[in-house]
Every structure is written in structure tokens, then in C-alpha cells.
């Protein structure tokens, strides 16, 4: 990637040796360092470490980094929304793309982009006059040092459960990677109910529901949305939201706590702004009310459990698969949690990539003891159509795994499809017949 510099001594900075010239600087990252000699052959004379980028790009903007297995996207989006509604100029970078001041600037890509691209986004936000830069921080980015050299104003932990073991190889390494983000003295906000959290106590505040914490929920109701009473020291505030589920109470609590820690002010005013946040597309998105159909990105055992527990008074029907060429150990666990909560299970594809979709389904099925519940249909579109058609009035259909993704990866092909649109099409056909 090529990023133009604000200093006359360098025309541009690149992490690709093939782009280098005598007037460029080459960024030495964990992945690009092996190409240093190739950059020299191109005539490049200036070599930069990530900490040097502050000399050439504008990065002096408060950075808020959110990490965790689940909840990063919703928590980040809620912080972004609250700050915007309070009148600040804000940038947001994450799974859904790069946003500035309620405008989509770049479409979705990696949760946390490569280091030079990330610095370029921060530089662009600073030049646009943004007061804050909110970003999701993935475990891959922490491990690959894609956030090296950045000075965060606040770091936030949502939770830690099992994920990405295809990359990290063990749960222990995954947990260590997440926790390493909180090793320094940077101001931090930690989920006190997360038993796996390990962090530097300096400048640490916490939030929680079950355990005493800096920001804590004194009482709450999850019937028909969220109603909660939040306390911080001697201050109390009421929080209302149309979002569903205890996991979203955690997400909103983290967001409210983060904004209060960043700007101070009245806790109640921040809660009032949080009430305006309508959620994120593909995250507990109610595509239809009658029948009730919900689309969500949940793709881990814990993420699925949180969704299931958000519907304690309804009969649950679930449709999901598991990503190919990814952590295989979680597949039977996903099957087991579905077996525990769901009345009927539709097993299908979720980006099978190079794997055989039927073999992935078989691995999920190993965790399901009541196999009579299962319907196996590897074609995700057909599975959704069938699930919608067979849905009964007292049931809720939860379509999990892909959220707002707009394509299905099969082999090397990316085939356009979106769960939400497939549901609406199926409902349209049913209503047309009736």
C-alpha cells in the first residue's frame, strides 16, 4: 500500500517493496521486514518502524480500541453512535467498514486492516476534523502487531470465549493474545464478569452485571427490550433500549461506560443517547415480526448461546453452518448448544470455502444427540426458504453465522447472497401464494 506523506523529505510511505523509489520510505512491519533488501534495490534509503509514522502522518486523535470474542461490532457502533448524537465528529473502523460522521467511506474488509492502511485511516479522520476514532481490534491484529505504535485513549474488553483456534492453535494462546492488549498502563475498561480477563490494574475501570464493578447494573429487565438502572460511584441513570438480550445489555453498558470515561458529563445524558442506537445490521436483526425471523452473526458456541437465551419464552428454530478452512473444534460444540436450546435445527453451509459442505455438517452433527430435530440442506438459500416455509406462529427462526455478509464463499467463488434478502424473498412468495 502507498500512503502519501505530509513531510517534504518523503513523497510516500509503502509496505510493498515493489512500489519503492528513491523518494519513498519503506515501512518495516512483522510481515514486510523480509523485503527490506528488495526495497533497497529499488533505491529506497529511508526505512521506518511503526513508531516513526507519527512524524509523517497525523495520528494525534483519541483512539478507542474494542476487543473481545463477541460484541466488538455492536459495542464499537454504539460508542460511535452515542458520540455522534452528543455532537462530536467521529470515525469508526471495523468489520462493517470505515465510517466518518455517519457516512460510509470504505466498504467492509478485515476487522482490523494492515498497519499502514490503519494509520492512513486515522490520518484521514484527523484531517477531516474527527474528535474520536473508534475501532475494533481483532486477535489476529494483536498477534500480528497491526496496531503497533498506536497510542490508545481507551481500550475495552467485551468478553473472551473460544474462537479462531485454526489460527491460535490453542485456547490458551488465544486468551493470552486478547489479554496482552491490556498489559500496559493505557486507560482501560474491562468486563468484570469475564473470568478469563487478565490486565494491568493501572488506569483500569470495570463494568458488569453479576459482579461489583466501577459501572454496574443495579437492576434490569429484558422483557420486550432492555430496561436497566446503571450506577457509577454515587451517580445513577436509567437506560432503555429496543435491543434484545443480555449480551446487548453488556454491549450498551460497555458503550455508555466508555463514553462517560472519555468525556465525563452526565451519565443520564449518555444513556439517553444510547437509547437512540438502533443496533447493527445483521446483529440480532429482526427481519420479520410475524413470523418472527432474526438474523445474527453469531458463529461460536458462546455467541449462539447468548442469542438463544434472548428468547426464553419462545420455541426456537435455528439455521446455521460453520465456516470452512476455519477452527474445526468448535463445530460439534455449536451443534451441542443448538441441540440444548432449539426445537428444530437446519444445518447448512456458511462459507464452506475449500471444504465439502456435507462433511462440515457431519462434524456439527456430532454434537447433536437428538438428530431427529435436524434438517440437513447444504444449499443455504434453499435451507432458509424451507425454514421460513415450515415456521409456525409460536416459533422464532434464528438464522446465524453470516449476519450482514453479502456473499457466500464456495470454493474460490464468491456468490452473492444475503440472509436478510433471502428471508424477505421467501416470505414474499409465501404471502403471494396465500
Curated annotation (Swiss-Prot):
Segments carrying motif Meso-diaminopimelate recognition motif: 350-353
Residue numbers carrying N6-carboxylysine: 178
InterPro entries: Folylpolyglutamate_synth_CS, Mur-like_cat_sf, Mur_ligase_C, Mur_ligase_C_dom_sf, Mur_ligase_cen, UDP-N-AcMur-Glu-dNH2Pim_ligase
Key words of the record: ATP-binding, Cell cycle, Cell division, Cell shape, Cell wall biogenesis/degradation, Cytoplasm, Ligase, Magnesium, Nucleotide-binding, Peptidoglycan synthesis
Role of this protein: Catalyzes the addition of meso-diaminopimelic acid to the nucleotide precursor UDP-N-acetylmuramoyl-L-alanyl-D-glutamate (UMAG) in the biosynthesis of bacterial cell-wall peptidoglycan.
Protein residues bound to meso-2,6-diaminopimelate: 326, 350-353, 401, 405
Protein's pathway: Cell wall biogenesis; peptidoglycan biosynthesis
Protein's recorded name: UDP-N-acetylmuramoyl-L-alanyl-D-glutamate--2,6-diaminopimelate ligase
Chain sites annotated for binding ATP: 68-74
SUPFAM superfamilies noted in UniProt: MurD-like peptide ligases, catalytic domain (SSF53623), MurD-like peptide ligases, peptide-binding domain (SSF53244)
Catalysed reaction equations from the record: UDP-N-acetyl-alpha-D-muramoyl-L-alanyl-D-glutamate + meso-2,6-diaminopimelate + ATP = UDP-N-acetyl-alpha-D-muramoyl-L-alanyl-gamma-D-glutamyl-meso-2,6-diaminopimelate + ADP + phosphate + H(+)
Gene: murE
Amino acid at each position: 500500500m502507498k500512503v502519501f506523506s505530509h513531510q517534504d523529505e518523503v513523497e510516500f510511505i509503502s509496505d510493498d517493496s515493489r512500489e519503492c523509489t528513491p523518494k519513498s520510505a519503506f515501512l518495516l512491519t512483522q510481515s514486510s521486514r523480509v523485503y527490506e533488501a528488495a526495497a533497497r534495490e529499488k533505491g529506497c534509503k529511508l526505512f521506518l518502524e511503526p513508531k516513526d509514522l507519527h512524524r509523517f502522518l497525523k495520528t494525534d486523535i483519541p483512539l478507542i480500541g474494542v476487543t473481545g470474542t463477541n460484541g466488538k461490532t455492536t459495542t464499537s457502533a454504539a460508542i460511535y453512535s452515542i458520540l455522534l448524537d452528543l455532537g462530536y465528529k467521529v470515525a469508526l473502523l471495523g468489520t462493517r467498514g470505515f465510517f466518518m460522521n455517519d457516512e460510509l467511506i470504505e466498504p467492509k474488509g478485515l476487522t482490523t486492516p494492515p498497519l499502514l492502511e490503519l494509520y492512513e485511516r486515522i490520518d484521514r479522520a484527523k484531517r477531516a476534523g474527527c474528535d474520536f476514532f473508534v475501532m475494533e481490534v481483532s486477535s489476529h491484529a494483536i498477534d500480528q502487531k497491526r496496531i503497533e505504535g498506536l497510542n490508545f485513549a481507551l481500550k475495552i474488553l467485551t468478553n473472551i470465549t473460544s474462537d479462531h483456534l485454526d489460527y491460535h492453535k490453542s485456547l490458551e494462546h488465544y486468551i493470552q493474545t486478547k489479554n496482552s492488549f491490556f498489559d500496559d498502563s493505557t486507560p482501560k475498561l474491562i468486563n468484570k464478569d469475564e473470568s478469563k480477563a487478565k490486565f494491568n490494574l493501572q488506569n483500569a475501570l470495570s463494568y458488569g452485571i453479576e459482579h461489583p464493578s466501577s459501572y454496574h447494573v443495579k437492576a434490569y429487565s429484558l422483557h420486550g427490550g432492555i430496561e436497566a438502572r446503571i450506577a457509577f460511584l454515587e451517580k445513577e441513570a436509567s437506560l432503555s433500549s429496543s435491543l434484545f438480550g443480555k449480551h446487548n445489555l453488556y454491549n450498551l453498558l460497555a458503550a455508555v461506560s466508555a463514553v462517560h470515561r472519555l468525556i465525563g458529563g452526565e451519565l443520564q445524558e449518555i444513556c439517553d443517547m444510547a437509547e437512540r442506537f438502533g443496533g447493527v445490521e445483521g446483529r440480532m436483526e429482526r427481519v420479520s415480526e410475524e413470523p418472527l425471523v432474526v438474523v445474527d452473526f453469531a458463529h461460536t458456541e458462546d455467541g449462539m448461546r447468548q442469542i438463544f437465551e434472548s428468547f426464553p419464552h419462545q420455541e426456537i428454530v435455528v439455521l446455521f453452518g460453520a465456516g470452512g478452512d476455519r477452527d474445526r473444534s468448535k463445530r460439534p460444540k455449536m451443534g451441542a448448544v443448538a441441540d440444548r436450546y432449539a426445537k428444530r435445527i437446519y444445518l447448512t453451509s456458511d462459507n464452506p470455502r475449500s471444504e465439502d459442505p456435507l462433511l462440515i455438517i457431519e462434524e456439527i452433527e456430532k454434537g447433536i444427540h437428538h438428530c431427529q430435530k435436524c434438517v440437513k440442506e447444504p444449499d443455504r438459500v434453499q435451507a432458509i426458504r424451507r425454514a421460513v416455509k415450515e415456521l409456525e406462529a409460536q416459533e422464532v427462526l434464528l438464522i446465524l453465522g453470516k449476519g450482514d455478509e453479502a456473499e457466500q464463499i464456495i470454493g474460490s467463488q464468491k456468490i452473492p447472497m444475503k440472509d436478510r434478502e433471502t428471508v424477505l424473498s421467501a416470505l414474499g412468495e409465501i404471502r403471494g401464494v396465500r
